[in-house]
Amino acid sequence: MVCESNNKSYLKSQNLKIIGKNSLRGNVKISGAKNSALVLLAASLLTDEKIILDNVPLLTDIEKMGNILKNLGVKLHNKDHQLIIDSKNISIQELPYELVNGLRASFFCIGALLTRFGKASLPLPGGCNIGERPINEHINGLRALGAEIIIEKEVVKAKLIKKKSKLFGANIRLNCPSVGATETLIMAASLAEGRTIIENAAREPEIQDLCQMLNKMGAKIYGAGKEKIIIDGVQKLHGCSHKVIPDRIEAGTFLIAAAATSSSITISPVIPNHLEAVLNKLEESGSKIEKKGNSISISGKSIKAVKIKTAPFPGFPTDLQAPFMALMTIAKGTSMISERIFENRMHHVNLLNQMGAAITVDDNTAIINGVKKLKGMNLVGSDLRSSAALIIAALISENISHIYGLEHLDRGYENFEFKLTKLGAKIIREVDGGIQTKSKNSSEIHPTKNLDINFNVA
């Protein structure tokens, strides 16, 4: 059983045609957080009662995760941005590789399935090609909880140790604050017997969102957002309603786009505390920031060079490293951006240089000498965030750019070009050299809302 989408596939021939040098102005509605929604979908497997999720973003990654759940026998019903999940009648089976390929979040299911049913079998996950993202921390942690795990032919097979009816609490110290491992172990420990303590845990807002939903379901989790998380296992979790937090990465991307184009926009809803590191660097680079309730306004001015090192939350997020580098290409002076999370996340450097940027890379540090202008090019984004960086670069470039590789963009940005166009950008999605959607006024450029997920089919 699979879901149906208005777009059956994302053709590599699709591209965004972008006319640069247009300022942005207005308000942007920020979607629900992709990285939160994905793990919350996995967490729904922990109960046989219904979970109602609101503010779910319409993204291809959400579509893929929904297909994974449906393959397990989960019933899904969605309307707009609400998703009702019924995991009562699950059939535990090995998921086909083609279903999980390209979606690293699929591996989140292993902790939930293992702790609820005593076994799980998943192919090794995929995702963006941005370097090694090993699952050693996940596996070592699950073993500490009492799981027996083997890897055969790229498939991870987990089960309870013989004579044990469930997982048992343990003290676990992560070698690094892995977000995925922290989330996987929290889910597994929620139904384990006894207390689990995770030290050196990741502190990201998405983890806090997961723990908030699990506690609504009856879990006993303490310390979310801190380096030490305590989970007292319970016998059973029940259903709940939960609203996905706003996407801080999407929010940051729009703020960076406004700064790059010397524009004034307001984004909402957002949680400003989730964006402190980004806001600090935007202010340092010359933008004026105003926070009011659940909204942030930015006024871009002359751009100054800054130094950035990516770091786990509350540090500067690695997912905004590429977009911020696009901003720094036209900054006054020399900027330095060091990537400290992933060892191979500089694919966008060569692409930005083709547009006229002056960037060199030494190990995992990019040195950006600001230039006066960029030029429009035809380029292919290599991953989700590099695609966003190229779009920002195209917005500030002279002439016209065509950005390909939209299958990456649509994984993580809901109606990205539609939102930009409402702000005044000149963007249209083309397919095979033709316009996918036209406005009544041919002089205007309007993109398509490119994904309409429908899980309400057998």
Swiss-Prot record:
This enzyme's EC code(s): 2.5.1.7
rRNA processing in keyword set: no
Listed GO biological process terms: cell division; cell wall organization; peptidoglycan biosynthetic process; regulation of cell shape; UDP-N-acetylgalactosamine biosynthetic process
Residues annotated to bind UDP-N-acetyl-alpha-D-glucosamine: R104, D319, I341
Pathway annotation from the record: Cell wall biogenesis; peptidoglycan biosynthesis
Catalyzed reactions per annotation: phosphoenolpyruvate + UDP-N-acetyl-alpha-D-glucosamine = UDP-N-acetyl-3-O-(1-carboxyvinyl)-alpha-D-glucosamine + phosphate
Keywords annotated in UniProt: Cell cycle, Cell division, Cell shape, Cell wall biogenesis/degradation, Cytoplasm, Peptidoglycan synthesis, Pyruvate, Transferase
Localization per Swiss-Prot or TrEMBL: Cytoplasm
Gene Ontology molecular functions: UDP-N-acetylglucosamine 1-carboxyvinyltransferase activity
Family annotation (InterPro entries): Enolpyruvate_Tfrase_dom, Enolpyruvate_Tfrase_sf, MurA_subfamily, RNA3'P_cycl/enolpyr_Trfase_a/b, UDP_GlcNAc_COvinyl_MurA
Residues modified as 2-(S-cysteinyl)pyruvic acid O-phosphothioketal: C128
One Pfam family per UniProt: EPSP_synthase
A cellular-component GO term for this protein: cytoplasm
Annotated function: Cell wall formation. Adds enolpyruvyl to UDP-N-acetylglucosamine.
Protein name according to UniProt: UDP-N-acetylglucosamine 1-carboxyvinyltransferase
Source organism of the structure: Prochlorococcus marinus (strain MIT 9515)
Lineage, highest ranks first: Bacteria, Bacillati, Cyanobacteriota, Cyanophyceae, Synechococcales
Gene: murA
